[in-house]
Amino acid sequence: MGKPKALLLGAIDHAQATWDALSDVAELVTPTAKNRAEFIEECKSGKLDGVVAAYRTFGSISITGLVDEELVKALPESLKFIAHNGAGYDQVDVHACKARGIRVSNVPSIPDDATADVNMFLILGALRGFNTSMLALRAGQWRGNPPPPLGHDPEGKVLGILGMGGIGRNLKKKAEVFGMSVIYHNRRKLSEEQSGGAEYVSFDELLTRSDVLSLNLPLN
């Protein structure tokens, strides 16, 4: 009996060696399709029969399009598992996959630190009016015309976090380094250990008390 087949959907940027190492236990295959129509036809032709697992990157959407009900129905009957390499899985219809008996995984904690870094950068930029100054600089006006306002220090400001998941908790730690106090609202109140001492408030109180409001949750 040969090795099970693992399908790569999309280019790998940082873990090619790890993917290649899977060849010890699986036959690694890559579709020849260049777009969704070709990929569906490739699936229907039987060329991908025997694939039991697929690893998809965000870039795979240019080949497969969304992993929706139409695509799921065309996937090989042998496919039992899809590994998605991001936290958000809005490109994958998990209900359609479940109906086909296909399990789907994601990596919810991987981007927490990097996302919170960018979040903090945007908060500082909003407080200090970075965008106005950058536009003036690119226009060749060192001080701006008229000069932009000085903006606000983060120290002493109240950061309201809506959605205290991994990103929200990570952001809380970074904001406190800049002297901000943190309040939050979540679907449920977190334990003292999970919240790191941040104050849990109602949604209305969050809007009332926050100097800066950070949304860290699915917008739908």
Task: Give residue spans per PLM region.
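Phosphate/diphosphate ligand-binding glycine-rich loop within oxidoreductases
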Residues: G50-R138
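Rossmann-like dinucleotide/phosphate-binding beta-alpha-beta segment
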Residues: F130, P147-N220
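N-terminal glycine-/charge-rich "phosphate-binding" loop or analogous flexible N-terminal tail
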Residues: M1-S62, G179-S181
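Structural alpha-helical scaffold elements that stabilize or flank donor/cofactor-binding regions
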Residues: L22, K44-K47, L71, L75, ...
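Phosphate-coordination loops involved in phosphoryl transfer and adenosine-cofactor binding
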Residues: K3, L79, E155-V158
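Short gly/ser/thr-rich secondary-structure transition/capping motifs
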Residues: P31-E38, I61-T64, A139-P146, E193-Y200
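Short loop/helix-cap segments at secondary-structure boundaries that form the rim of catalytic
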Residues: A17-S23, V92-A99, R188-G197
